[in-house]
Amino acid sequence: MKQMVFMLVTLLLGTAGSFALSPVYGLSIYYLYAVLRPQFIWEHHEFAGMAIGDMQWSLYVALATLAATFLWRAGLFAPSKVSAPPWYGNPPFTRSHYLFMAFTAWISLTFPTAVSTDRAWPFFVEYVKIFTMFICATFILRTIRDLWTVYFVVLGGAVYVGYEINTYYLNGGWLLLASRGYGGLDNNGAALIVAMAVPMCYFAWEASSGWWRWLFLLAIPPLLHAVLLSYSRGAMASLGLTAFVIFLRARNKKFLGVCYLIGFVLVLIMAGPEIRERFFSIGKADVDESFQSRQNTWAIAIRMANERPLFGLGIRNSNLFTYDYGADIPGRSIHSQYLQTAADSGWVALLLYGLFLGSLFVGLYRSRRILRPYTDPESLKVQSIASGVECAMVLFCIGAFALSLEHFEMPYIMMVLAVQLNAITRAVATRLAPPAAAPSQPAMPGTFRPGIVAS
């Protein structure tokens, strides 16, 4: 019953809250559902004859959020918490916004040009959902407080996923992800959700104050254990490599170094012989059939993209032909986010995707550079959210080399947070910049007050 109560309360907050308070609440609940996937984990829970798995919770929240955003930005209706714009104005569209729009347009073009539109249709629908909510989010997220709201809600969902994975294992020895996947994601996709939550937890701890901040650190060991239980070598390796970036971005490096030592010991304790064997087989490419299969599909993807460089074979059409190109079994996926994009939608799509990711990281760098001279608490919090989002994205980008996750919503959530963070910091910097001085007068230095960003 408690699961149904949770769903009804969040549904009310996401729908009515979008109109009464702010569309930020609807967006946050929509993204919570995207990460939590309640129809999967609670599919058999019901109350008064109504099962959680029978309702389209995300659809109701999405429609309410889109409607409230349209009415608000069209000037027809203003929810109470967004009746006035921020003091620095609405964040402008940046290069990253336009690159994402270009990527969206090109991916959409590869649906009507697909070899099989029937095959492409369900995956195209998933793209439309992701793109629509991403674009909607760029109009909704206007303050740092908005970004933190989404950040914490999504992080809570990811931590709960880790809790469920651990609960299934501890109560019955069942490896949920390895046996069943997670709500349409295979073990690799679900493991990345949990792995991306690790740097998010650390930088949430760094940004917070009070005793409850330690709950973020306490959540990390169960998350690590959940990643191990996934048997996803891609997620394990991505998290290990991202640890270096987390260390570079951390403010208290000595404390983090101690945490790394403790974490290393915990991983050795938590990882059984099967997990250790699974992880260390990454380096045994000559005997690892999985790695050899990936190498083969990568070569196939390059051939496909070279033959159809503009539009590719069509969204998710490459799986239909990998066997004809020499894959070991029919329907074999490419197992690389980047090469899958090239095979399905052409080299142009991959170029736009790469440019967008590059612009995103440049934007995060510029945001940190603006804030670097300032040590007030609000500026440090903004630096923390930038670091948390950046490290989560680095982890995804590493994992995407060997995993095919083009409809994976978690990175798109991080992307929109990164894009809007850069837009907000640019808007603040522009507003606080001193006016241009007359030619005969020296320009007076301006005082940047980044702490105001949080309002």
What feature does the model see in each segment?
Residues 70-75, 163, 225-230, 247-289, ...:
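A membrane-periplasm/extracellular boundary helix in multi-pass inner-membrane enzymes
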Residues 1-108, 118, 122, 142-152, ...:
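Transmembrane signal-anchor hairpin modules in multi-pass inner-membrane enzymes, especially those
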Residues 2, 51-60, 122-123, 182-195, ...:
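Membrane-interface micro-motifs in multi-pass membrane enzymes
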Residues 118, 122, 231-234, 332-336, ...:
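Membrane-interface catalytic loops of GT-C/OST-like multi-pass glycosylation enzymes that act
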Residues 10-19, 64-69, 100-112, 128-136, ...:
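Alpha-helical transmembrane segments of multi-pass inner-membrane proteins
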Residues 175-176, 181-183, 273-275, 283-345, ...:
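Long extracytoplasmic/lumenal interhelical loops at the membrane interface
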Residues 255, 260, 345-394, 417, ...:
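Hydrophobic transmembrane alpha-helices and their immediate junctions
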Residues 32-42, 342-345, 379-422:
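Membrane helix-loop boundary segments at the extracytoplasmic
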